[in-house]
């Protein structure tokens, strides 16, 4: 038997350490490398914690809590109800408050892109006359820095949000909670990517003085826009609604247009708004973020639940929040995003993973729904087959599917919903996120896009924190 085995061509499946497959390849043996990691990534403390959770007397309560979290995500019905300045609507906003993406961070520890966005926002708000003065003010202790997520908000990339910026107002019709996010500056050299020169400030001024009031008054006429229905339509039209938004932006401006033309503004001002929207498909990107935030907040704070309700990054740390552990962040080091760079830039120019936009993946779209948007690989890299596989694979770490938001290419499977920290811990499969890449230095902006995963440390800490909280 052994003689016949080794006298014929071999096709070896290698599980685990890649060095074995590398050695076989050098000997011209066909090898399939199976990407596998042991439960808890081999950390026996985490393995024991996972076993304790699975065998806990609380098992029935955990299952019921997780089912409730999944149902709240699925049953959430977010609608856009208006636009207004942050100072008027965002809980806790003051003239000297700056909200930012990701878990809490101090000025001293912020990455270049976030510092660039903060100084630009302080100049925009008239709190500093130039960027140097803004940096001094930011370091003085006079400015309150706080995560967007702790103010019912989300913020794209650096996520910097200040008092006079106009915000989406999204209401969860099912549960009544409201979520906010600022408006898209469109793409490349923009504040949220760390750019802060006069052209950036001028654009922010126009958004505050022209676009914001027009959209605010348009929504007073329209009343509400059904975002869950629009999201489902956009996915069926080839978006994944994180980094590809061609369909979503078309649908959103289509819904806003009747209100815009009835709101009483000049034809010239209306033209400026329409041209601005047409300049990039990203106009609806923040809209989906606020929609997802409204749904995920409804699932937060359910006792015993192991469902992830927040994934967010500040360019230094990646942070998770878990439904059954309200008020806590579980952090690990932000990772490098892997993907195509714009001409003239190289990977070492890039900052680390940043932004609250991973709320889209937390809900089940973006990287989780890449099978709806095969064309996204032109932006973030990889192959169409890999994009489709990501959507299948994410089902292994989630509790169910959302029948309201489906993937045609996978037989209209609902998007994978409700990431479970225990499933991530047991399988070693990490959530997939597609995202933009900001330059590591302030003042530059977007330089690429790609794929990234959270560090396992976030899930490790969350699993151990859950066990500590519930005495398991």
Swiss-Prot record:
This is Uncharacterized protein YahG. It holds the Pfam family AllG. Coiled coil: none annotated. Disulfide bonds: none annotated. InterPro entries: AllG-like, OXTCase_su_AllG_h-dom. Belongs to the AllG family. It comes from the Bacteria. It comes from Escherichia coli (strain K12).
